Amino acid sequence: MPESAAAPIHLPKTSESERLKRIRHTTSHILAMAVQKLFPKAQVTIGPWIENGFYYDFDHPEPFSEKDLRLIEKEMVKIIKRKLPVIREEVTREEAERRIRALGEPYKLEILQDLEEPITIYHLGDEWWDLCAGPHVENTGEIDPKAIALESVAGAYWRGDETKAQLQRIYGTAWETPEQLAEYKRRKEEALRRDHRKVGKELGLFIFADPVGPGLPLWTPRGTVLRSTLEDFLKKEQLKRGYLPVVTPHIARVDLFKTSGHWQKYKEDMFPLMAEDAEAAAHEQGFVLKPMNCPFHIQIYKSELRSYRDLPLRLAEFGTVYRYEQSGELGGLTRVRGFTVDDSHLFVTPEQLDAEFLNVVDLILTVFRCLRLNKFKARLSFRDPKSDKYIGSDEAWSKAEAAIQRAVEQLGMEHFLGIGEAAFYGPKLDFIFEDALGREWQLGTVQVDYNLPERFDLEYVAEDNTRRRPVMIHRAPFGSLERLIGILIEEYAGDFPFWLAPEQVRLLPVGDEQRPYAERVAAQLRERGVRVSVDRSGDRLGKQIRNAETQKIPVMGIIGAKEVEHETVSIRTRAAGDVGTFALEHLIAKLTSAMAAIHGDIDWS
């Protein structure tokens, strides 16, 4: 590295840094103290640290403005500079209640009711205190006032319940050094530039419409081409590996999900029951939108008696599922209410489990490589034995977790443990992708399941003619197709690789007299599967080029009188500018070769 080059600034995650956790937690208290000093009518609720900072929720009759945030920020700096001691105090429940009632803080009183003893209070000097379990810094002077910033105000419901009071959530960020804060702001600005909601609108890929509803994207022709290209790619990979396509409906009787356990363990995330009448509703009889595809694939498995010779049976579907996300949790394509999962369920014998699991991991890694998603880590998402959110026996869980552990050890794959991250019916191997801005997203997943085969009484006839229970593998290399596309838009900043671009080539005729030849070239390219258009605007060539580059078309074909005479096309790319003039057949060969290679670039030499 040249001596003048600055080393990249590492931004630690809150979960990785005890010091940063304390800084952010204390800064949230400083925020609350500042708000109550400036706005005495504000009532406090909760204020935790989060991944990139902190927030605090307030009940205040007037909305906080941008001007208010700057005033609050200045007050926070004053508090920090006073170097107030942060003092922990243990009190009885009765004493805590007495103090809270004296302050007139109803939300804190409700929080107190759920707390177990000992009850702890943290003081900022002798002027302000909060119910809190910690941890915190010892003195506000440990926080660098130049390394904090308030960012925004958003609405939030008390305890996440839309039927309860709407609060104002002030978000802030805090770092160890001003340099880290500056780097965080730089990355945030870059994230705004890449935001898939902004870029997707500019490229005309998808829309949201109020009459349709929040969290329900509508895909335009260009966006649908992008979706279809991804689906076709995975379908071909699955075909090579012996997967069989299936299609299942969007709704089913609620009893199906009672058997699977979704109704008992996942009901809050499902859309409400569709009952024919009040009596049916009272007895929880009717239909529901499916939250997952697995119970449907199980019914296909059960439709006939299976032999060990039929296994492994690999059923695959791009199935749309529905989750009732709260409106405040929705976010573009990455958090929606209706989304498509590249779902597959493998029914295998216990002896086939390890090999099939490894084959699924190989498929996921192939997908990541082709999509150029190279920075990821594997998480062993196991159950929390202390939680009651899971179904099945301890023995089934132990066997499933052991199978995943064996696989990652056999592959020599770096991994980390995520206790409590399992699905309610089985453990998972999740692939966590880190994007260009250091943000983490869960994409591919593969799960081992002994529980649903038991709940649905699945069987196969073994070689000794006895009835045995298969094991299920759930897998989704993409995860949610909507989320994947949102991530890809931001990772590529809308500049998709050639094979994936919704519009791969745009032909730019210099004048009207060159347009007939451009149309003939386009027709020949379409016959070979190239996604091509002709600019029919009549604009000058320079404007045509600018428009194509703005719309991130990877290849532009310029056609003037010389190109018509010699039946050639002059090529310009977004990546390299002018790359030369090519005979039509030569150009077609290069483009189709690049499409077949998928993750390779076009060789223009």
From Swiss-Prot:
GO terms for biological process: threonyl-tRNA aminoacylation. Binds 1 zinc ion per subunit. It catalyses: tRNA(Thr) + L-threonine + ATP = L-threonyl-tRNA(Thr) + AMP + diphosphate + H(+). Its EC number is 6.1.1.3. SMART domains: tRNA_SAD. Zn(2+) binds at residues 294, 345, 474. The keyword Cell division does not apply. Its cofactor is Zn(2+). Residues 195-497 are annotated as: Catalytic. It is found in: Cytoplasm. InterPro entries: aa-tRNA-synt_IIb, aa-tRNA-synth_II, aa-tRNA-synth_II/BPL/LPL, Anticodon-bd, Anticodon-bd_dom_sf, Thr-tRNA-ligase_IIa, Thr/Ala-tRNA-synth_IIc_edit, ThrRS_anticodon. GO terms for molecular function: ATP binding; metal ion binding; threonine-tRNA ligase activity; tRNA binding. Coiled coil: none annotated. GO terms for cellular component: cytoplasm. Keywords: Aminoacyl-tRNA synthetase, ATP-binding, Cytoplasm, Ligase, Metal-binding, Nucleotide-binding, Protein biosynthesis, RNA-binding, tRNA-binding, Zinc. Catalyzes the attachment of threonine to tRNA(Thr) in a two-step reaction: L-threonine is first activated by ATP to form Thr-AMP and then transferred to the acceptor end of tRNA(Thr). Also edits incorrectly charged L-seryl-tRNA(Thr). NCBIfam families: thrS. Homodimer. Belongs to the class-II aminoacyl-tRNA synthetase family. This is Threonine--tRNA ligase. It comes from Thermosynechococcus vestitus (strain NIES-2133 / IAM M-273 / BP-1).
